[in-house]
Amino acid sequence: MPKDFPRARRVADQIQRELPELIRQEVKDPRVGMLTITEVEVNRDMEFAKVYFTTMGGEAEHAACLQGLQRASGFLRSQLSHRMQLRVVPKLTFVYDRSVEHGMALSRLIETAVAEDAKHPKDE
């Protein structure tokens, strides 16, 4: 591995690969439906992992999914310990990722600006 690719990043990448499969196969909580893990950040000493996720639906669905994930975090951590070759698996903290919503809002603003610009003839 290159020197500029730290171990914490590799652990985060592995958690990002393993976690969706574990959630899909092992978590039986109906609040945790279809979700996407967008990013995992592991701190330098690999004690904590912040897991960013997105789901479809409204604010109530996001909150319910977050509650389900928080409730299952200990179980998911223990399942990760069986799959990963680590002495200590990081404690998982789940955070709803609003970047997709922000991106869609920006796209709508750009489309609106382009449509408004198209209505006005260009000055030449």
From Swiss-Prot:
Its main location: cytoplasm. It holds the Pfam family RBFA. GO terms for biological process: maturation of SSU-rRNA. InterPro entries: KH_dom-like_a/b, RbfA, RbfA_dom_sf, Ribosome-bd_factorA_CS. The keyword Protease does not apply. One of its GO terms (cellular component) is cytosol. It is found in: Cytoplasm. GO terms for molecular function: ribosomal small subunit binding. Keywords: Cytoplasm, Ribosome biogenesis. Belongs to the RbfA family. Monomer. Binds 30S ribosomal subunits, but not 50S ribosomal subunits or 70S ribosomes. One of several proteins that assist in the late maturation steps of the functional core of the 30S ribosomal subunit. Associates with free 30S ribosomal subunits (but not with 30S subunits that are part of 70S ribosomes or polysomes). Required for efficient processing of 16S rRNA. May interact with the 5'-terminal helix region of 16S rRNA. HAMAP family: RbfA. This is Ribosome-binding factor A. The gene is rbfA.
